[in-house]
């Protein structure tokens, strides 16, 4: 069990940035998403301060699919990050959060006409082209509007990032982008470059998520730059922007071995600079897109324990008042987490429990084989590292209301997303 910066133990109770879990339950109830605001800000600054170059401009985008709400986007914007958006809703949220939309990059493999029109309306700065159909539609919409927009082409490097199959994105048969080994890509690039309303500036690449091997990132840089050099030589173009995506691995359990982030970012930029020189490129900007690595460890989910049960087969369960509706990642990926009884932090962890949710679903598990003190009804159980792809992937399965989100900082807390009510559950029903 790992306590992150900002987590302390006071009289046997877990505090997050100076706020006790019992106080959080009393004020907001459970289940509850809790984020350490200082940790969010520090992660933003780690990326901004260490991914820097004297040879070209650098830009850090927040991949908002990890966790999107007005307040987290306000923080990212204040800290100088751009934003990666993938839907009408993410564009709208960033816009309403006050983002400079010129710093927004619109991704996705199936952008709709409505989404593209809205993106242009609010001034999204860059659109990332994913496929032929999308390219034709973007060109048509931009031409009709009389606007111009910067575009990147998403490419696949074929790099095998050693991660879960569902979050690999650079395989040759991935649904995203174009393979750099497909000869047809050169004709496409030439055609895009000839469009007067599309300002073709470069390429986007992303090899996957939750990657712990530095060499995967470094190899991808080399492949992208080698391809960029070929494009420039064959087509007589100058490529000015490379977006290298994200995928930086984070800690969930002791099985994970994330690299030290600041050190990696400095090493990463050195590799980018060196390979750019090796291939004779004249880049003006290099972009990265962290999401999970910005928010994951800053967030936790606080639950109340209901029942405790030992089965005939000997498995002991702790039942909590949330589950797969607020965290579907175990059901999707068999994702692993750490749990703690946050009101019994000084007691011996001498019992092995399976932490299960309240959904009417046999797969509604949160943590398998968690070592905890003896659990009782009314205990507070905290699952850590839920700050990415929990709130954003949550659902109303079993007609459960979505959870509130609270930010804590220096001994105080504030509500940033209201929890849903029963009336919210039927608001759209007819």
Predicted regions and their residues:
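Acidic, His- and aromatic-enriched active-site or binding-groove loops in soluble protein domains
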Residues: 154, 174-183, 309-317
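Active-site loop/helix belt of alpha/beta enzymes
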Residues: 2-3, 158-304, 409
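Short acidic, glycine/serine/threonine-rich loops at helix termini
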Residues: 73, 96, 116-121, 138-141, ...
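Short beta-strand segments
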Residues: 63, 150-156, 204-206, 243-245, ...
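A charged N-terminal "starter" segment
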Residues: 1-150, 186, 190, 194-199, ...
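Charged (often Lys/Glu-rich) extended helix/loop segments that serve as interaction or gating elements
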Residues: 273, 281-430
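Short clusters of hydrophobic/aromatic residues that line enzyme substrate/ligand-binding pockets
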Residues: 7, 14, 176-178, 355, ...
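Active-site-proximal loop/turn and secondary-structure-junction residues that shape catalytic pockets
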Residues: 66-68, 89-90, 110-112, 131-133, ...
């Amino acid at each position: 069990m790992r306590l992150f910066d900002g987590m302390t133990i006071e009289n046997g109770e877990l505090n997050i940035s100076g706020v006790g879990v019992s106080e959080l339950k009393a004020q907001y109830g459970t289940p509850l998403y809790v984020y350490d605001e200082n940790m969010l800000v520090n992660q933003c600054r780690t990326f901004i301060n260490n991914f820097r170059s004297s040879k070209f401009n650098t830009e850090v985008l927040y991949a908002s699919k990890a966790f999107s709400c007005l307040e987290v986007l306000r923080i990212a914007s204040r800290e100088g990050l751009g934003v990666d958006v993938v839907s009408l809703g993410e564009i709208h949220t960033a816009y309403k959060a006050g983002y400079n939309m010129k710093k927004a990059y619109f991704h996705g493999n199936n952008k709709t006409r409505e989404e593209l029109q809205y993106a242009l309306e609010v001034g999204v700065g860059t659109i990332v082209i994913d496929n032929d159909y999308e390219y034709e539609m973007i060109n048509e919409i931009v031409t009709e509007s009389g606007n111009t927009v910067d575009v990147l082409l998403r490419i696949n490097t074929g790099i095998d990032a050693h991660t879960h199959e569902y979050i690999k994105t650079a395989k040759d048969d991935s649904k995203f982008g174009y393979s750099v080994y497909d000869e047809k890509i050169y004709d496409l690039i030439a055609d895009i470059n000839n469009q007067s309303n599309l300002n073709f500036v470069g390429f986007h690449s992303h090899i996957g998520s939750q990657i712990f091997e530095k060499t995967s990132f470094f190899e991808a840089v080399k492949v992208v730059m080698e391809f960029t050099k070929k494009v420039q030589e064959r087509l007589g173009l100058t490529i000015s922007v490379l977006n290298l995506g994200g995928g930086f691995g984070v800690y969930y359990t002791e099985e994970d071995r994330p690299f030290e982030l600041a050190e990696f970012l400095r090493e990463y930029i050195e590799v980018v600079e060196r390979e750019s020189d090796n291939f004779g490129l004249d880049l003006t900007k290099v972009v990265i897109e962290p999401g999970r690595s910005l928010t994951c460890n800053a967030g936790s989910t606080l639950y109340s324990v209901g029942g405790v049960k030992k089965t005939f087969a000997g498995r002991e369960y702790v039942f909590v008042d949330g589950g797969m509706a607020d965290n579907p990642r175990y059901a999707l990926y068999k994702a692993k987490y750490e749990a703690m009884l946050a009101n019994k932090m000084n007691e011996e962890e001498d019992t092995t429990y399976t932490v299960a949710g309240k959904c009417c679903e046999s797969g509604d598990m949160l943590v398998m084989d968690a070592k905890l003190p003896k659990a009782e009804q009314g205990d507070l159980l905290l699952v850590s590292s839920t700050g990415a792809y929990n709130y954003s992937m949550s659902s109303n399965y079993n007609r459960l209301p979505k959870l509130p989100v609270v930010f804590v900082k220096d001994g105080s807390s504030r509500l940033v997303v209201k929890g849903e009510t029963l009336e919210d559950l039927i608001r759209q029903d007819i």
